[in-house]
Amino acid sequence: MKHYIIVKFVEGTDWRALEKPIRGIFEQTLSIPGIHSVELRLSNSDRPNRYDLMIVMDMDKEALPAYDLSEPHLRWKSEYGGLVAKKAIFDCDED
């Protein structure tokens, strides 16, 4: 399945500077059984009604509970949650 995390950071956040440390956190999730890949995509738009960052994870559906409880996921939330104005989480099966 695909797990999407789409993030809009708080106005004034230099979110482009956060790419490397956020990527480092999410790359650690690759050690969780059933997580196959992680991609980070930065927005190419500065429009205020656009989201800033998209994280795309390819995983087995059964890996989602382990991911939710994992140290990288909890660290992502504790270190960056205060910088997030809004986010969308979307899961889907691949065709």
Segments from the language model and where they lie:
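Glycine-rich beta-strand-turn "strand-cap" elements at beta-sheet edges
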Residues: 39-51, 77-95
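Short, well-ordered beta-strand segments in beta-rich or mixed alpha/beta enzyme
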Residues: 2-8, 40-70
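Short, conserved charged micro-motifs
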Residues: 13-19, 63-67
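Non-catalytic alpha-helical scaffold/packing segments enriched in small hydrophobic residues
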Residues: 4, 21-24
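An amphipathic, aromatic/His-enriched active-site/gating alpha helix that lines ligand/cofactor pockets
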Residues: 24, 30-33, 58-90
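Compositionally biased, intrinsically disordered low-complexity regions
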Residues: 7, 12-13, 29, 95
